[in-house]
Amino acid sequence: QRQMCIRDRQSVLNGDRETGVTAMQMDVGLDTGDILKVVKTEIGVNETSGELFDRLSLMGGELILDTLSALEKGEITPIKQDESLATHTSKIDKSLCPIDFTKPSFEVHNKIRGLNPWPIATTEINGKKIKVHSSLLCEKSGKAGTVISTKPLIVACGEKSVELCEIQPEGKKKMTAEAFLAGHRLSVGDVIG
């Protein structure tokens, strides 16, 4: 139901399990035309918004061809959109980047996935800004923001925890958390964020 071109990113941020692409007739409004055809897809639990965008782009290309063919054959009946069901997404910007580890792990994980490839979720380790490119959900618990494992790098959240998989120190290239830890001091019990 979300409208506008950033809905794939918003779907990941919200933890939606499904999204899709829609072919619609153009009209004077923005995304208000009649619906011609819809294709839905599941969102992978670790899929980033960038990966989802790439998949939806391919699906959209196929949908255009299918829609034009079906229109030519008279197989499509346009469906009016119910504006009362429409939701509008908010702007995505760098103010969303800081990770709040007091949130449940699924919210932290969705933020990391949803802000990849831009603007990328961030945290601080030993007072230095770190971009977090990917994560995995974990079952372990601890005090929010506390490192509960360094092999792999797991940080406790408000509920459960996340493994930080790929990170990028300020001014450096993206690397695995393991590579980062080989050159930086971080111990179980340290607090990040």
Regions found by a protein language model. Give the residues of each.
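Acyl-group handling in specialized metabolite and lipid biosynthesis
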Residues: 90-103
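Donor/substrate-binding cores of folate-linked one-carbon enzymes
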Residues: 1-88, 95
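Sequence-level motif detector for i,i+2 pairs with an aromatic at +2
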Residues: 18, 32-33, 94-96, 127, ...
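Short, flexible, solvent-exposed loop/turn segments with mixed acidic/basic and small polar residues
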Residues: 87-90, 154-156
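An anion-binding loop in the catalytic cleft
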Residues: 101-193
